[in-house]
């Protein structure tokens, strides 16, 4: 199908930037807290700051907002300490007035947390589509504030998405960067920056994240669940088996693309790889040095999730299709698409060029992604393959959406070819903001919404990963509100 255009919800808003610096000793005064942009409140637990206000999800009829309440007087290992509070979210039409004190009570929709919590994620439903709304979040009277000056959060105004006509045809959920087997989050090299960990004895956070994604997909009535790369930490046999066990708890169908962490690994890097099948790279896939070394690669991931560098097609109940692409290389984090796979992908797309199609691959493909991600262009799909891939999309008007993970961030990128397809990078399931992207299919388009992981374990982990990267995780991962919430007309 041809697309008539893209409608976005909300304006430009960076994720809430934390100013926390790890390594600072525990504080004895509020002035040393990194959460400086906040309101001070008090309850039976003591003084707290209501901070980190962030608009998470905007749909045609709902608004989801999150914030946290931190101890106003102390830090632990340079990070703020959560304080349980009662939370409240109030939402009202902007047309009723911007000052809540003068708004008619009947115009205000109000929801409360179910109990005390340090992390608050509240949703107001029953809103009108394509309408400006004001909102106010507070914990026991302390008004939650964004940590830095964000657009929607500072203005406290959002616009709901337009409503697509007709009945909902199908919902699918797409997650990425789960990293089953990983034990520390937020590091670049070694233990730097200081990582987030779960407390001793707690369930591993990648498993908490994937279980929450699966539960969220089940609650949404999703027919299918997709993991777009980096399902595992390093594709060790026990990681692959555990990931498969968790995915099999989803009541519908699931499919997985391969990410750089899921690539075949060298047997000499870890004795555990020895139990897995030998992987023979195709001709020309290895450098001369690698060939001379006679490297022994093992593909534990492929034994459960399919052959490397081959595309797959998943037929949707709504009449569309999802096409998965393997963009991994050997021995590096960058991306490539082998010529045989590129040819096969071209055949798939050309076979039904106007059929509504979502394409997913782990590595981002646009020049904008290449030159804005912290890992430099070497971190994404190589430029030659990226242009070949985009030209295939350009020749296939039915491609409505191209989804990538890998960068652990939310971003809507401009393509480098003349296409109306939307190119998205989607946030990681295991690190802030922790969740998955829900796609709802209608006759005339797709509703795209990021949904935060739910549950006490998931929220506890969200607070921990929120303060990785020296508190910059929201700026690096959340992206803009309209990169996570949009309507694609197709």
Q: Regions from the language model: what does each represent?
A:
Residues 33-161:
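Beta-strand-enriched, solvent-exposed domains that form extended recognition/catalytic surfaces
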Residues 2-21:
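N-terminal export signals
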Residues 46, 443-490:
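A short C-terminal boundary segment appended to hydrolase-like catalytic domains
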Residues 140-144, 152-164, 241-346, 417-425, ...:
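Extended active-site neighborhood of metal-dependent phosphoesterases/phosphodiesterases
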Residues 16-35:
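C-terminal region of N-terminal signal peptides and the immediate post-cleavage residues
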């Amino acid at each position: 199908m041809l697309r008539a255009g893209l409608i976005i919800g909300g304006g430009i808003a960076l994720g809430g930037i934390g100013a926390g610096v790890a390594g600072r000793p525990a504080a004895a005064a509020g002035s040393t807290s990194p959460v400086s942009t906040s309101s001070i409140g008090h309850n039976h637990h003591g003084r707290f700051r209501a901070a980190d206000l962030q608009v998470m999800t905007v749909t045609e009829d709902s608004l989801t907002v999150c914030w946290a309440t931190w101890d106003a007087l102390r830090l632990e290992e340079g990070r703020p300490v959560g304080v349980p509070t009662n939370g409240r979210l109030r939402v009202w039409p902007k047309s009723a007035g911007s000052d809540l004190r003068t708004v008619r009570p009947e115009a205000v929709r109000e929801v409360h947390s179910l109990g005390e919590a340090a992390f608050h994620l509240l949703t107001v439903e029953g809103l009108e589509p394509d309408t400006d709304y004001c909102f106010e979040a507070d914990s026991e009277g302390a008004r939650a504030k964004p940590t830095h000056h964000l657009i929607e959060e500072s203005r406290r105004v959002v616009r709901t998405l337009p409503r697509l006509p007709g009945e909902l045809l199908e919902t699918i959920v797409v997650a990425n960067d789960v990293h089953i087997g990983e034990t520390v989050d937020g590091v670049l090299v070694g233990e730097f920056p200081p990582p987030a960990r779960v407390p001793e004895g707690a369930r591993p956070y990648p498993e908490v994240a994937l279980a929450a994604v699966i539960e969220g997909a089940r609650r949404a009535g999703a027919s299918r669940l997709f993991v777009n790369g980096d399902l595992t930490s390093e594709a060790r046999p026990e990681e692959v088996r555990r990931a498969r066990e968790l995915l099999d708890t989803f009541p519908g169908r699931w499919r997985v693309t391969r990410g750089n962490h899921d690539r075949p690994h060298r047997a000499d890097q870890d004795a555990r790889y020895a139990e897995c099948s030998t992987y023979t790279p195709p001709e020309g896939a290895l450098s001369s040095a690698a060939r001379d070394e006679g490297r022994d690669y093992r593909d534990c991931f492929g034994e459960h999730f399919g052959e490397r560098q081959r595309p797959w097609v998943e037929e949707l109940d709504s009449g569309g299709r999802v096409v998965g692409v393997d963009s991994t290389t050997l021995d590096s984090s960058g991306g490539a698409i082998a010529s045989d796979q590129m040819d096969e992908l071209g055949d798939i797309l050309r076979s039904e060029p106007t059929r509504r199609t979502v394409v997913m691959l782990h590595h981002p493909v646009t020049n904008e992604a290449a030159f804005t991600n912290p890992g430099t262009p070497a971190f994404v799909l190589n430029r030659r393959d990226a242009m070949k891939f985009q030209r295939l999309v350009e020749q296939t008007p039915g491609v409505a959406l191209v989804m990538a993970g890998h960068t652990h961030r939310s971003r809507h990128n401009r393509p480098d070819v003349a296409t109306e397809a939307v190119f998205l990078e989607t946030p990681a399931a295991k690190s802030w903001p922790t969740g998955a992207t829900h796609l709802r299919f209608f006759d005339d388009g797709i509703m795209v919404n990021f949904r935060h992981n739910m549950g006490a374990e998931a929220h506890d982990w969200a607070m921990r990963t929120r303060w990785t990267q020296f508190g910059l995780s929201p700026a690096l991962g959340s992206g803009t509100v309209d990169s996570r919430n949009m309507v694609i007309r197709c």
